[in-house]
Swiss-Prot record:
The keyword Mitochondrion does not apply. Keywords: Developmental protein, DNA-binding, Homeobox, Nucleus. This is Short stature homeobox protein 2. It comes from Rattus norvegicus. GO terms for cellular component: nucleus.
Length: 237
């Protein structure tokens, strides 16, 4: 470009007006540069085309995904020929489907979808994840509003109160050391029948302790009265 401008300046005669025209060669270079710039912008704007699957194609893809998450090249080729898709599109679909499956599995393991596990079939979520096993037993009964854990907690609280009362009546001196030294609390994993039996046993212990305390008190009063009578008889009153 500098050479062309220099040639134009040298060809100009002294005293003549300044040249305003550009040489044809310089015009061609400018047009070529502009064309390359437009071509680069066109390449940048190009995006990958998205494939719109039909319902039949999706059903076939999901059916094969239920059988295996990693189909081999022969299975992909056969499926692509049957569905009229390219093998690359089938492979990309399986990659996206596996990523979606892993995301659902992570949500299930985190407990996000435990309550809504029925929305996903076990084979669709993953063949190696049993969704039914993740559901709690009490979720099968929609009319039950109380969970087994709440039953165990309630029984444990009742048993704990009974144990505290029994321990206080049996030996007040050991109350400062805590009732669990004498009656350790049962774990939450015990069945409800065991907790109920332990609660009834503790209640019977409380009743026996109260009865023993009353009997001891009555016998002490009777002994005091008998001693008073003997003392009065000895003094001749």
């Amino acid at each position: 470009r500098e050479l062309d401008m220099g040639a134009a300046e040298r060809s100009r005669e002294p005293g003549s007006p300044r040249l305003t025209e550009v040489s044809p060669e310089l015009k061609d270079r400018k047009e070529d540069a502009k064309g390359m710039e437009d071509e680069g912008q066109t390449k940048i704007k190009q995006r990958r085309s998205r494939t719109n699957f039909t319902l039949e194609q999706l059903n076939e893809l999901e059916r094969l995904f239920d059988e295996t998450h990693y189909p081999d090249a022969f299975m992909r080729e056969e499926l692509s020929q049957r569905l009229g898709l390219s093998e690359a599109r089938v492979q990309v679909w399986f990659q996206n489907r596996r990523a979606k499956c892993r995301k659902q599995e992570n949500q299930l393991h985190k407990g996000v979808l435990i309550g809504a596990a029925s929305q996903f079939e076990a084979c669709r979520v993953a063949p190696y994840v049993n969704v039914g096993a993740l559901r709690m037993p009490f979720q099968q009964d929609s009319h039950c509003n109380v969970t087994p854990l709440s039953f165990q907690v309630q029984a444990h609280v009742q048993l704990d109160s009974a144990v505290r009362a029994a321990h206080h009546h049996l030996h007040p001196h050991l109350a400062a050391h805590g009732p669990y030294m004498m009656f350790p609390a049962p774990p939450f994993g015990l069945p409800l029948a065991t907790l109920a039996a332990d609660s009834a046993s503790a209640a019977s212990v409380v009743a026996a302790a109260a009865a023993a305390k009353t009997t001891s008190k009555n016998s002490s009063i009777a002994d005091l009265r008998l001693k008073a009578k003997k003392h009065a008889a000895a003094l001749g009153l």
